[in-house]
């Protein structure tokens, strides 16, 4: 009976827990874990292979080596369980207790724990307020530290070297206590009175003025409060007892040949035990101090190496000269405990094989080789065979399966029916890398994959392998079928567009069947219905491309969603009529009445999904594929060398270019142009020539002449095989055809610069040796790039997933009214992304009014779908405030309204959706497509001439946005602000284009004017920066003395004289401090004031300014007083591609970032200091002026006396996101980062929805910095979680106390991941040691809210179906609280019941 009870006891349910706390272990605690002390360094006996007693593998301490058998063999078998053998002292138990039981080593002298000593910032150092260097000198026995000064002049914590110590001894005798080593440190830590220290620090902080000191004090204060709050004692950072890991976690395995393979930990432990025992002996013998000291130091080093080898000094190496793997190395890195065993586990019931095409499969099927299926579904087959009575035992069933009897195959077919399997292709970059399919048994050994899912897997059939996994439990099968089935994943989660889109052969076939040809057989016939067309085509009476008329019946949905039948006669071709047969009801014939290129097919599937739903779309996609394959086979499209038609104009174009290049070469030789100009001109020339050749070639390829049925010669689109492939989007592009039939063009060197001599040949003509050599140069770089890119992109994805992993949709609506203002994304005047596309799938945050009225046309809280988008565009709305993940106020997670539509499903997102991970995958997955290189704006890569005017593309009405301007005498406006924009709106009031207007631009239209397309509405000189007057008057020169501050220059060509202001460093001593200016006076010579201010109207002239007005001249409003020549923009590398995305997400400050105005006010320049200008902004509200020093070489956009607004650009350069956040707020930052990241992806043609980037941004903006602590417990300058601060402020508000004030902080993704609330998540990401050290000292609790923490502790994740499980568990536990019974009570009750039943 007792055995039964014990069994029950052992089977006890794992304790349910809500949080995991990490802390420091006290010596008592370490002893309480221990099952005995390890006293000897021996491991096992080399003859008997039995563990030595009291050694590192001792069976008495750790438990038996064999199940239920003591070491000497006296007690064997289960009946003796729990007996302790009197001979060998081993308890009879399961051998697996050797994985759980720990031991300890009593250290003869205390030892500092290296993590708390060396992991920066040193915790021991902070607490004791000593530098790490000093503490190390004490610990490693180089100097003494005063512990108790007694009545002497020494101070507590003072360091003494040997000499000073002996002097002090002579002077004071035994009045003071100074020691060295870890015991001294332990004494000092023990003596710290936390409460007293905390009080002292809290008083001290407000009284100090120096920033650095405040920082240091608040760091100490934080640490002390952490110790006080967590119940850890400071002296526990010094070890007096060392725990020993269970032996089966550091195994010793005999190899053949009498050698052993051992874990490095055993060596490290042996070293510690040896030194510890030697030290004990020396202390017993009371050996000389110097020997003991040396031994103590060696013990300290041995323990250091065991805990974290290599952290201090040289790493201890084993016999093979490799550093030994210490405890810290066991848990960190890719091979460490976290990433290898806790986050990534191996999967049972899986197989892998090569994939081949399965063109006959349905979308939800995959072909599974019989051999594989038999192995994967073995347990199910055994069960079925037994159930059927075909086999009596499992053993018999096994035999049947091994012999592969015919009934086994029948049973297999039955088992497999409707049992989905998961197919996965590595690398799994997004969630579509694992999908579920129903298996179909096939012969052969390769898995068959449906061609349409290849895009999602990024798979091709050149030898790719895929893995198959079997979902075993009913729940797993259910989830696989309902959520992961390939038919449920038609849309891409990244952008909401179909990802099940035909490509290659299928596209070619569909394109071929929907093309029209002139004068094909059967042209002009009229058919009664589609069936008739089909019959005539099969009979060979009409060609596939013939133009015909057909009467069709279509069912279309009208605006209200009701289906309407429609009969009409349409002009079409035979192929299109045939294709319409597979189109589902509800779509109009117009969707197929055009040549089906790849984009058109994608649109068709998208429309099908939105109009007729999922099921029809899946059937339709399959039908499209079958049709496409059939007709691409019939088409017989193939390429021969004669398809590459070389244009006749090629030779002429190349000849002309060569002549021009010769001309430039001769100019260079005679010194008329510089090397750089020559290079740029030549490259420009060749790129132009290349474009001309390719234009001629495409014109040649794309058209062919045919005879129509009237006998005339007409042109039609070509049926050239290569042209059809490129035009349909099946394979190849114009650029590739250009290399085959045009000219290869300019080649790049590995550093991105372009080689001057182009390759004039194409692949049809063949390359010469030199040409081939030139082209290999850049091609190798491409391959090397790809390898690097994959690794970098993977690392970016990992950081993104880590920062966003705990973001899950946790509620329907957080009730916020905030959001982001959405406007169309306009670049260089073009609308790149219309408003409709940007708000699709978002929830409107505030009512949208009809322009110019008070009528609400879109109420707040509307989820914008395709119909609403049409409606918004019809009503010409050009800005909408939408809910956004950034402004969501849900505390943990995010609400469904702020996220909007689940892109992969097309409806509002469900609670439990792991939107953070989806966002990270959507951004990271296309990472490999981005380029690695930084673009040189040089050569032909991407050179644009500087813009000098605005020419409108569409006619419409002019709108001017935040433009300050003055009106000139001739009626034109002159811009006097920097951020002005000019927009053109159409008749509906929709903005079609938008242009930036620089300072000094002359605008020839006014607000509300009508302009025609092509009109030039503004002009400026791109190479100079004007200074414009805002009033009329007479010019007076101030401080402009020739030869001292200015020099006169006469232009040789025009004979005009200019006055140029000299740079301060070129002036004679007399002119160094004079600041030349132009002052405006009225006719009586009185100073004029700037309009609306009491500032004298004088314009200070910067160095090199050219003054164009004479002293005493009369000028009018808007005239230019002076021009500052602008250096032509230096060719700086623009970081593009992947590195740019990484920089933005890491929130790195760019080099030479643009300088923004910190406050709104008036600009003035103060006294210059060495090499810097002093910029002073006087705020308009009369507060203190703001000063900033700016290096002289920075080009400033502002002049003395000018008004700027907070956040306006003062000096150009790349923007610093931190500045944008600080000065312009969260929404400006969101707009900037979203646009910048989208620009990189758009360049590669990748579509990602904005909300994914916003989701990551939300995680980067989690933290705030406390600027005033109010009555809260926060310290000024602390970084806290935003939600934490808001909750605390709510509490303070309720108690009528002062709340804390804070500013938002932007963290890069790596930093944000490391500073999450969960230490498990942070530790498993990077810098494991540092994270765990900090968490242990502060006694952190991890509430397991994210996904990663739950995976690590082995639970379901709180997302998707797991979220329901977690909330249900919580609900049950809350209901059960009072009913909790302790285990001992249950045991007592059971025992009593059993005893009373008479045993």
From Swiss-Prot:
Residues that bind Mg(2+): 460, 462, 464
- Keyword Heme recorded: no
* Record InterPro entries: DNA-dir_RpoC_beta_prime (IPR045867), DNA-dir_RpoC_beta_prime_bact (IPR012754), RNA_pol_asu (IPR000722), RNA_pol_N (IPR006592), RNA_pol_Rpb1_1 (IPR007080), RNA_pol_Rpb1_3 (IPR007066), RNA_pol_Rpb1_3_sf (IPR042102), RNA_pol_Rpb1_4 (IPR007083)
Q: Name one GO cellular component term.
A: DNA-directed RNA polymerase complex
- What reaction does this catalyse? RNA(n) + a ribonucleoside 5'-triphosphate = RNA(n+1) + diphosphate
Co-factor note (free text): Binds 1 Mg(2+) ion per subunit.
Q: Per UniProt, where does Zn(2+) 1 bind? A: 70, 72, 85, 88
Q: Name one GO biological process term.
A: DNA-templated transcription
Q: Which Gene3D superfamilies match?
A: 1.10.132.30, 1.10.150.390, 1.10.1790.20, 1.10.40.90, 2.40.40.20, 2.40.50.100, RNA polymerase II, clamp domain, RNA polymerase Rpb1, domain 3
**E.C. numbers:** 2.7.7.6
> What cofactor requirement does the entry state?
Mg(2+); Zn(2+)
Which keywords annotate this record? DNA-directed RNA polymerase, Magnesium, Metal-binding, Nucleotidyltransferase, Transcription, Transferase, Zinc
**GO molecular function list:** DNA binding; DNA-directed RNA polymerase activity; magnesium ion binding; zinc ion binding
Q: Where along this sequence does the record place binding of Zn(2+) 2?
A: 814, 888, 895, 898
Determine if Ubl conjugation is one of this entry's keywords: no
Assembly and oligomerization: The RNAP catalytic core consists of 2 alpha, 1 beta, 1 beta' and 1 omega subunit. When a sigma factor is associated with the core the holoenzyme is formed, which can initiate transcription.
HAMAP family referenced in this protein's UniProt entry, alphabetically? RNApol_bact_RpoC (MF_01322)
Family membership noted in the UniProt record: Belongs to the RNA polymerase beta' chain family.
Task: Give the protein's biological function.
Answer: DNA-dependent RNA polymerase catalyzes the transcription of DNA into RNA using the four ribonucleoside triphosphates as substrates.
User: NCBIfam families, per this entry?
Assistant: rpoC_TIGR
This protein's name: DNA-directed RNA polymerase subunit beta'
Can you name the source organism?
Pseudomonas fluorescens (strain Pf0-1)
Taxonomy, top ranks, is: Bacteria, Pseudomonadati, Pseudomonadota, Gammaproteobacteria, Pseudomonadales
